[in-house]
Structures are given as C-alpha cells and as structure tokens.
A protein has these predicted regions:
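Interfacial helix-cap and linker-helix signal at transmembrane-aqueous boundaries
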Residues: 7-8, 88-100, 177-178, 208-209, ...
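C-terminal ends and interior cores of transmembrane alpha-helices
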Residues: 22-35, 224-236
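Hydrophobic core of transmembrane alpha-helices in multi-pass small-molecule transporters
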Residues: 27, 38-54, 160, 240-254
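Intracellular juxtamembrane helix-capping segments at the cytosolic ends
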Residues: 53-67, 254-267
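Helix-loop-helix hairpin linking two adjacent transmembrane segments in secondary transporters
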Residues: 78-126
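A late C-terminal transmembrane helix in Major Facilitator Superfamily
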Residues: 86, 266-303, 311
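Extracytoplasmic gate region of multi-pass secondary transporters
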Residues: 150-207
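C-terminal transmembrane helical hairpin of 12-TM major facilitator-type secondary transporters
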Residues: 192-204, 209-262
Length: 341
C-alpha cells in the first residue's frame, strides 16, 4: 500500500481500479485451483498487494481531494462500502460453501467481483486538485500549523493503538459468544449486525468531521469505541449484546472515516495518497497486534475478560495520544499567531 501511495502521488490513480479488478478476480479464480499452502499464501499476497492495496488508500486520497465541500461525507460514503462488504460477502460465501463447496465459491466470487468492479473501474478519474498539484513545480501553500511529517507521525502512532483496540472484538467476538453458550449462527449474526452498523458509522463519522473538525471527530469516535469494547465479556442478555455491538460497530467504523478525514484535511493534495497509505500501514499493524493480543491474553487467563479489558486500555492510550496531538496543534497555532502579530 505504501508503494502504491507513492506511485499514485507521482502518476495518479486513473488505472488503479482497473488493475485491481483483474488482480483480485484473477487471484480468486486461481485460488479455486490451488493445491498447496504455499499457493494459498502466494495468491492471497497477490490479492492484497495488487488488489486491495490499490483500491483503498490511493483511491481514498483521490475521492477526498475531489471534494472541497463536505469531503468528510464523501470519504465516509466511500468507506461505508467496505463495511457493507464485510457484513454481506462472508454471509453469502458461507451459503455458497454449504451449497457448492469451496472451489465453486472462489470461482463465483471471482466472476461477481469482475462483473461489479470492472465497469466502476472504467469511471475512475483523477481529482483536478491532485492533478494540478502533481504538475506544479512548487509545493502547495498549507494553512495547517504542523508539518506533514509531524502530522503523519502523530496519526500513525495513534492508529496503532486505535486499531489494536478495535480488532479484538472483530477477531474474538464470535468465539467469545460461542464460549458463552450462543450458537454459531447467533454469534455470526451479531458480528454481521456490528458490521452493518459500521456502514452507517463510516458515513456519519465522515460527516461529523465536516461539522466539528477532523480531530475532534476522531476523538469522539475513539471514546465511544473504547467505552463500548469493555462490556462484551460481561453481557449475558441477547438484547444487550446486540445493543453494544451496534454502538461499537458505529463508533469503530466512525474512527476509520475520521482517520481518513484527518489525513485529508492536514496534508496537501500532492502528499495525500502517500499519507493515507503510511497511516493505513500502521493501522494494519495495529489490527494484527490486537488480534494477537486478544488470543494471547485468552490463552494466558482462560477467559476473554482480560482480552477486552486490554482492548479498552490500549483504546485509552490512543485517546491520550490524540489529546496530546490536539494540544500540540493548539500550541503551534498560538505560536504562529503571535509571530504574525
């Protein structure tokens, strides 16, 4: 993703969707024919490196800079598609697996993705703002008080803890519920509801960034995510579990949109794709760390209480970093205002 961010800032994203459409559908079809674990890992590497990585951060940067009015809403709507896919596609694949088996499911996935993605990919155009910035020999004039490097440093550090917090329920909610006596169907339905509420959370999280500011939106959604994640192991009623799942899904997805809006509003168009790719890199690291942490603490204690309490603690660390970031911005802004006077 970081490599594609550099390429996108230098050459644009005009053909990214088209390349990704063929890469992902081709990888899915090849997976239907794989016969070894090395082929399995290799094909998923191709799927991620030449597919998913090309249609996430670089295209988010493109979308964000297409809109000067309500860019947060535009990014939120774009990001919400991922939440819908995370809820619906696994459910449909599970039905297909039961009916047709894994090979046919991979082939159907490849055909469906190509049929859906190819026409959309042909419509992608580079945003005029990014295209103009790329052609200008001098850097854009920025009004944000911190340098782009410092902005990316703050967001990257925060996002590690933020994504560590959110990935614990995403990875461990289903086993937590099945261990608590829920059936697998009930547990996966809760996860699907969580993801679907995330689609709305991404839209409203982006819009909130337009209304109250990018960083305040990030902090509000982070607080909601941190407060809600703690309660999962201590709930015993179905209604309470669904309620907390909806709240967590809404806020964790709002966090994801808020991160995109922060990056969009704090860096220049010329640096946008690289910035989003770098922060996403650290976000994926945090997602992996959270999944590992939740499993490790479960193995250590024999229950999920420590895992979800650990998620809340790293969520608090994330919020503290964001608070320091906000104070740093305020202090730097005051210093610049005093210099101007």
């Amino acid at each position: 993703g970081v490599l594609w961010g550099y390429i996108a800032d230098r050459y644009g994203t005009r053909w990214f969707g088209l390349i990704a459409a063929f890469a992902m559908s081709g990888s899915l079809f090849a997976l239907s024919q794989q016969e070894s674990i090395l082929q399995f890992y290799g094909l998923y590497f191709l799927f991620g490196a030449f597919g998913n990585a090309m249609v996430t951060s670089p295209l988010f940067a493109n979308v964000g800079f297409w809109f000067t009015h309500k860019p947060g809403l535009a990014l939120g709507i774009t990001a919400s598609g991922g939440a819908v896919g995370q809820a619906v596609v696994p459910y449909l694949c599970a039905l297909s697996l039961e009916q047709y088996g894994w090979q046919t499911t991979y082939m159907l996935s490849a055909a469906c993705y190509l049929a859906l993605a190819l026409p959309v990919a042909l419509l992608i155009r580079e945003s005029p703002g990014r295209e103009l910035a790329r052609l200008q020999p001098v850097d854009e004039v920025r009004t944000f008080p911190l340098s782009e490097r410092e902005v990316i440093m703050w967001i990257s550090v925060a996002i590690i803890f933020c994504c560590t917090c959110m990935s614990v329920p995403i990875v461990h909610l289903v086993p937590l519920l099945t261990d608590s006596g829920f059936s697998l169907d009930e547990a996966t339905t809760v996860l699907m509801v969580l993801m679907l509420s995330g689609a709305l959370g991404r839209v409203l999280g982006g819009r909130l960034g337009d209304l109250i500011g990018a960083l305040p939106s990030y902090m509000v959604m982070s607080a909601g995510q941190t407060l809600s994640v703690f309660w999962f192991p201590f709930l015993d009623s179905t209604e309470a579990i669904y309620l907390v799942a909806v709240v967590f899904g809404f806020t964790y997805s709002g966090v994801m949109s808020a991160i995109l809006v922060c990056t969009r509003m704090m860096v220049s168009a010329k640096f946008g794709a690289r910035a989003m790719s770098i922060t996403s890199f650290f976000g994926w690291f945090g997602m992996g760390a959270g999944g590992f942490m939740g499993g490790y603490l479960f193995d250590l204690t024999g229950n999920y209480e420590a895992s979800f309490m650990g998620a809340m603690i790293v969520g608090c660390v994330n919020f503290a970093i964001l608070l320091l970031f906000a104070l740093r911005i305020r202090r730097q802004s005051r210093g610049l205002d005093e210099q101007a006077v």
